[in-house]
Amino acid sequence: MGLCKCPKRKVTNLFCYEHRVNVCEFCLVDNHPNCVVQSYLNWLTDQDYDPNCSLCHTTLTQGETIRLNCLHLLHWRCFDDWAASFPPTTAPAGYRCPCCSQEVFPPINEVSPLIEKLREQLKQSNWARNALGLPVLPELNRPVKNIAPIPPPPPPQVKHVSYDDSPAQKEIPIHHNRSETPATHLEMEDTASYSVSNSDVTFARKKNFASESSSDTRPLLRQDRDADNEENKYKRRPTIDWMRGLWRAKHGTGVPEDRTSGRKMAIFVMFLALLALITIITVLKRAGYNGEHSSDPMFDPMANPNIRVAVDDSRLPHL
């Protein structure tokens, strides 16, 4: 369980693998539509994730996506084609996630932002409307693809070559008559690349994620994020972080900080310090504390025998 960092501050067990933060269902729908999100316990067990679609094996950022009730993310077009291949008489329970075999259609009495968005996306296809008991719309019918017939291959052409026993042809070596083998190219799943000395065979190793550009140097996480690493994850937060959290909850983090906002923050801190000082002094005064040496007789001038104080007597003449 964790606390989402949005202004709603909801307790959630969902965790974004790409941004490494706890997210509630509201943030999942609004701010993380194409991110890989699973439970926090799964993140603690295994931190590896695949940013590609499980059906077409391409990156999820290419095209519209759909998030099922089991939190698995797929391309909407791939999932629509996959589900439309089922027979029309398939029951709603027969449509299951291709990753975990959990039912695609959520229960009727279950309500959440994620499920509401899922139902709205499923209503865009007639196979889902039929399973949900909704009327089928003609404008949502899938177009029939006209497959052009493949023409038969042309018959092989045989060339008639005449051979003669000329002396020039006898000088050709024996191995020259063998047909030349074309170069063979193999692709292996790894990150290294090498080639052997034989010029006919070339080995090339392919990257695991060929769709991603190797020149992309954008950081995965922001530099000013609140990193929940292993060192300070369960430590007690200082007071300044608590005050900064209240400030962000009220004013947000989207507005860039300028000198005016920093000055306001400094004035606010000085005001709190002055208020705390006045409160401490008032409490000490009401408790009767007048200083460290207020009850020490050594500092009482009337108890010192070397100090003589004139007593006001009416019998003594006044000078």
From Swiss-Prot:
Membrane topology annotation: Single-pass membrane protein
Primary subcellular site in the record, as a coarse category: membrane
Keyword Transmembrane in annotation: yes
Biased composition (Basic and acidic residues): 219-232
Span list, region Disordered: 212-232
Presence of the UniProt keyword Repeat in the record: no
PROSITE patterns in the cross-refs: ZF_RING_2 (PS50089)
Cross-referenced InterPro entries: ZFPL1, Znf_RING, Znf_RING/FYVE/PHD
GO cellular component: Golgi apparatus; membrane
Transmembrane segments: 264-284
SUPFAM superfamilies: RING/U-box
Keywords, comma-separated and alphabetical: Membrane, Metal-binding, Transmembrane, Transmembrane helix, Zinc, Zinc-finger
Compartment(s) of residence: Membrane
Zinc finger annotations (B box-type) as residue ranges: 1-43
First and last residues of each zinc finger (RING-type): 53-101
A molecular function GO annotation: zinc ion binding
Recorded family membership: Belongs to the ZFPL1 family.
Protein name in the entry: Zinc finger protein-like 1 homolog
Protein's organism: Caenorhabditis briggsae
